[in-house]
Each structure stands twice: as C-alpha cells, then as structure tokens.
C-alpha cells in the first residue's frame, strides 16, 4: 500500500491527497480542542461519529441545492471531498444566545435572538480568529461582494434546513459555524460549502431537558461527551439499535445504563 501524501493537518481533521486530481481525503480525528486550542483532549470515537453526521448533513443539503465539497464517505473515518480554495472566513449563524455573544453583549444564555444573526470571523489561529465586519472582508479582498452574497444566502438556507431537521428529533440548533471554499472552472469560480457540520461546530440542546449534546460538554468539563455525540447520531438514525427520536434524553440515566456514574 502506497503512503498517502498529507496536505494539511488541523485540530480535528487531516487532509490527504486524493485518488484523482481535484480531490482530497478528509480524515476525522478523535482530538478535541477548545478556546483556540488552549485546551486539548480526546473524545473516543468522535471522528467516526462526526464523519457519519457530516456525511448525512452534507448529503441532505445537496438534495436542496446547496453545493458542497462532499463526494462520498470512504470508511469509518474518511470521506472523499473536492479540493477547494478555502475562503479565510468562519461564518457563525446564531439563533439563540450562547457562548461568545453572551459574554460580549451580556445576553443571558438561552435567550432566543430577535432574528437569525450571521457573524464573520477571520480564520487565523495566531490571532485567535478575530471577529470581523463585511467591510474588512471587502477591504482586504478575502471574498468578493458576489461571493459574500452567495455565502450569506447559503448560510441562511442551511440554517433554515438544519433548524427543521434537528427540531424533528427534539434538538434545538442554538448556533453553528460554516466554512466555504472556491472551486475553479477555467477563469471562473463558484462558492461551495466545505469543512464539516457536526457536534464539533454546532451547539445542540435537547428541547425537553436542555442537555448540551455538543462540544460544550468538553469545553465546560461537563463529561459525557461520547454519549452526547452518539445521542445526536442515534436520533438521526445513524446508529444501530435506534430507539427513535421521540425519547427524552437524560444524560445521567444514559451514563448509568453504560455503567458510568
């Protein structure tokens, strides 16, 4: 077996050269980070779950006309994706106050926002991914006006779809992050959705209990990260022995069933 050439390694994934020109293999790791990688750890099986969830979400988004980099899942931890020129902007879509917006503006966590809010952050770990305005994006040429129109339009469409998808399994989509890239056809380019959509980059709360089913369990030392990620996958029908989405999730009881305190 020939050794694959590594293209890039991030906090949660590794990108390898793909089997055909214009493709990459995206490998999902179990590594977990928070606070711009100041906190590090491992969530066992996270890469496998995130691979499945992201495959499921990207496939469904493609069905409603959202262009993405996803081609197909290769195995438990890898998927084949289109190679894209990543736009250095992290797009955060917020429906309910939580995380940094609560700290910045003094809004109580859990308060529904008057309307969906889109924020932009410059992707630079050394700078701590600072929040930016559209004027910064235009000034420094990170994306054109037309690309930003496509990005904001797709972000709203993705949010509308995901809110409904998660509500159907008794989960509130509090906020989430998206990344976009360009693919080229000669002198012309178009914007596509890239990276992943999983509990790593979404805040997901059980509608009944308020339990956090995402990486906040790692950020806040709440424990039960593995069970929370698995619960999201189970409700989406991605795990065997699916008990259906109608059950109320009680993380304490779930851990006891697994022999944990």
Curated annotation (Swiss-Prot):
Q: What is its EC number?
A: 6.3.2.6
| Gene3D superfamilies referenced in this protein's UniProt entry, alphabetically | ATP-grasp fold, B domain (3.30.470.20), Phosphorylase Kinase, domain 1 (3.30.200.20)
Which pathway does the database say it acts in?
Answer: Purine metabolism; IMP biosynthesis via de novo pathway; 5-amino-1-(5-phospho-D-ribosyl)imidazole-4-carboxamide from 5-amino-1-(5-phospho-D-ribosyl)imidazole-4-carboxylate: step 1/2
Protein's organism: Novosphingobium aromaticivorans (strain ATCC 700278 / DSM 12444 / CCUG 56034 / CIP 105152 / NBRC 16084 / F199)
Q: Which UniProt keywords apply?
A: ATP-binding, Ligase, Nucleotide-binding, Purine biosynthesis
Transmembrane portions of the chain = none
Source taxon at top rank: Bacteria
GO biological process, any = 'de novo' IMP biosynthetic process
Task: Spell out the protein name for this chain.
Answer: Phosphoribosylaminoimidazole-succinocarboxamide synthase
A Pfam family the protein falls into: SAICAR_synt
Instruction: List cellular component terms (GO).
Output: cytosol
For this chain, the family text in UniProt reads: Belongs to the SAICAR synthetase family.
Reaction catalysed by this enzyme = 5-amino-1-(5-phospho-D-ribosyl)imidazole-4-carboxylate + L-aspartate + ATP = (2S)-2-[5-amino-1-(5-phospho-beta-D-ribosyl)imidazole-4-carboxamido]succinate + ADP + phosphate + 2 H(+)
Q: Would the keyword Ligase turn up in this protein's UniProt record?
A: yes
Task: Give the InterPro entries listed for this entry.
Answer: SAICAR_synt/ADE2_N, SAICAR_synt_PurC, SAICAR_synth, SAICAR_synthetase, SAICAR_synthetase_CS
What's a single GO MF annotation on this record? Answer: ATP binding
What EC class does the entry list? ligase
HAMAP family (alphabetical): SAICAR_synth
Taxonomy of origin reads: Bacteria, Pseudomonadati, Pseudomonadota, Alphaproteobacteria, Sphingomonadales
